[in-house]
Amino acid sequence: ITGAEAMMRSLEHQGVTTIFGYPGGSIMPVFDALYDHQNTLNHILVRHEQGAAHAAQGFARVSGEVGVCLVTSGPGATNTITGIADAMIDSTPIVVIAGQVGTGFLGTDAFQEVDLVGITQPIAKWSYQIRRAEDVAWAVARAFYIARSGRPGPVVLDFAKDAQNAKTKYEPAKLDFIRSYVPVPDTDEDSVKEAAELINNAERPLVLVGQGVELGNAQSELRAFIEKADMPAGCTLLGLSALPTDHPLNKGMLGMHGNLGPNINTNKCDVLIAVGMRFDDRVTGNLATYAKQAKVIHFDIDPAEVNKNVKVDIAVLGDCKNTLAAVTGLLKENKHTEWNDSFKEYEKVEEEKVIRPELYPATDSLTMGEVARAVSEATHHEAVLVTDVGQNQMISARYFKYSKERSIITSGGLGTMGFGLPAAIGATFGAPERTVCVFMGDGGLQMNIQELGTIMEQKAPVKIICLNNNFLGNVRQWQAMFFNRRYSFTPMLNPDYMKIASAYDIPSKRVYSREELKVAIDEMLATDGPFLLEACVIEEGNVLPMTPPGGSVNQMLLEC
């Protein structure tokens, strides 16, 4: 068989069912082979290769499986770079298969030749160029093993065109060990005992829940861990659905636009327990003042994250599904009633100063928060929330509630505008049984708006909620707060989104009032297929609370 056919069989052997891609010259032999595998491999034709990468991310994040995208060389490959970088920083398992010029043309600046391996090595777990057809099965097995094992991430396969056409004998390859690669470090038993002892003696423990809990499918272990010791928990943006919002020990969201309680009490706890999170700057604020009073325990699968940003006292390395269970087995039944009650005063202040004005505003105009909460309630808090980046991201994350696992998909570390729409498409294929709602701003919607064509063709049931404030809202908020309201190129003149939706044969509705909003949400959710809901919200609405740039987590601003 050809190398291209070997690629198809190798993908099937890995359990792949869905591919997001865009054909072109240097990948045509693979697409020709794909023509005969349409019964087993569902190819989704995107409208831009960046959309393919983000769709693969959305598929992976909601399903826990490896997302796959297939593109051509040159601009096709470079168009995936943002998605690869996004997947790397957010630990998302995807495999990007790109065509490449024939081996005889490498290094000659041939048509649509780029050094994809060189470009992607810093932003991928592994980048490899396939130059021989006989290497296909091995390379694919290695790629999927690396992408999904340990701390997940993106892998790039650069597939030379002559290797696609060359003949080879195919044998399925299985790989579960690479000598130079240790995906899960050994857990030190002493660290488990020390962590348990420190927690047992803590008076004010606080657990920080990251996406690693979901990546490790450790949600039930997390609940057992915090419940046994009666420990309050705060969730990072990517970890929000690892613990149900209404769980009594869930104190809310961490970070720059998170909730007061878990942020301020980070600097009041005596033991800080981080689980599957990396202490990024959006969570810590000013590191010089971050949790200096606390002993720090860090559960993580990646040794590189330990002591990178925050000095830890005990590192518990390994898969958190196993390490949490091990530590929980050594914990004493405990109660921290007074400590848990201390969060209530912050909840009361935030409710009065921020939440009520956002959800029950005095103005007739819609706020971003009330739109998000209304959609969450209408879906019984069971929808998959996909967000773009900006105010829409922070506001929907704050006001959505999460009752199911793997319910938030967003660009966390890279902050990629244009992520939301294609990621939502991927999510509908990764979890077809669930309602997928994507919140976007009027800025981000236009960054990959061409993917409405993919939605139209696939009839993907994406529920698109555009929060239209005629601004690049997040940047405008910073300009208002820190740049004397000098709105430098943040006001936006927008197209008529209703006409755009109509052109793509997507039902749509524009709303200005609360009465219109309720009717439109009901119509959106009753529609079998995609729907675009444009909510015209207060133009200069802000996302609060907010940790100011360079500020500490206990210096959150409640007003602009």
Residue ranges of predicted features:
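N-terminal alpha/beta PP-like core and its mobile active-site loop of ThDP/TPP-dependent enzymes
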Residues: I1-E338, A378-H381, P461-I464, A501
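Active-site diphosphate/adenylate-binding microenvironment
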Residues: A4-T17, G25, V30-Y35, E347-A427, ...
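Active-site nucleophile and cofactor-binding loops and adjacent substrate-binding regions
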Residues: Y22-G24, H43-H54, C69-G76, R131-A133, ...
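A general structural motif
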Residues: H48-E49, T108-A110, V182-A196, L254-G258, ...
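Thiamine diphosphate
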Residues: I97, L106-Q112, N307-N309, A315-L317, ...
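Phosphate/pyrophosphate-binding active-site segments
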Residues: E134, E197, Q293-V389, R514-E523, ...
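Generic enzyme active-site microenvironment
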Residues: V156, H298, V386, F439-M440
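Conserved short loop/turn motifs at secondary-structure junctions
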Residues: G210-E214, Y360, G441
